């Protein structure tokens, strides 16, 4: 099966969400009469203010697969709390054989991330972050690992509430 990496495309609609297509794969289903060709698309959608969603779609034609993926990404959006355009703290995300390390960065650093991770941070509204991926470089696994790490991230207020202390005690 041939694999095609699509260019990352951005499309702003009237709802203010940013959309990026991460990859499109050509897939085949072998049946008695031969092969049935189809396409699988992977996309991310964000609002530029910490909300992010991932979707995948399959269809016989590329535009239909991409539209299905975009619709799923819009339905599955989650909120991630950011701190001045970067992450709250260093975090590691895992999915399958993919492991992703994400670190907050000071102002002016930019988004230092490869492939699918860069698309996620751009649609999310993160402007300064440093990332490193280990293991699997499969786009689907990297996106899931990145989202896993972002969902593990907690704010100083949440940590203080868990420990029964004030935010000032936590921050030192």
From Swiss-Prot:
List the PROSITE patterns.
Answer: RIBOSOMAL_S5, S5_DSRBD
Cellular component terms per the entry's GO annotation? small ribosomal subunit
Which keywords, in A-to-Z order, does the entry hold?
Ribonucleoprotein, Ribosomal protein, RNA-binding, rRNA-binding
InterPro entries of this UniProt entry? Ribosomal_Su5_D2-typ_SF, Ribosomal_uS5, Ribosomal_uS5_bac-type, Ribosomal_uS5_C, Ribosomal_uS5_N, Ribosomal_uS5_N_CS, Ribsml_uS5_D2-typ_fold_subgr
Please state every residue range assigned to the domain named S5 DRBM.
Answer: 17-80
Q: Which GO terms describe its biological process?
A: translation
The answer to keyword rRNA-binding applying to this record is yes
* GO terms assigned for molecular function: rRNA binding; structural constituent of ribosome
The entry's family comment says:
Belongs to the universal ribosomal protein uS5 family.
What does the record give as the function of this protein?
A: With S4 and S12 plays an important role in translational accuracy.
Q: How does this polypeptide assemble, per the annotation?
A: Part of the 30S ribosomal subunit. Contacts proteins S4 and S8.
- Domain comment text? The N-terminal domain interacts with the head of the 30S subunit; the C-terminal domain interacts with the body and contacts protein S4. The interaction surface between S4 and S5 is involved in control of translational fidelity.
The family database entries (PANTHER family) matched by this protein are listed as:
MITOCHONDRIAL RIBOSOMAL PROTEIN S5
What name does UniProt use for this protein?
Small ribosomal subunit protein uS5
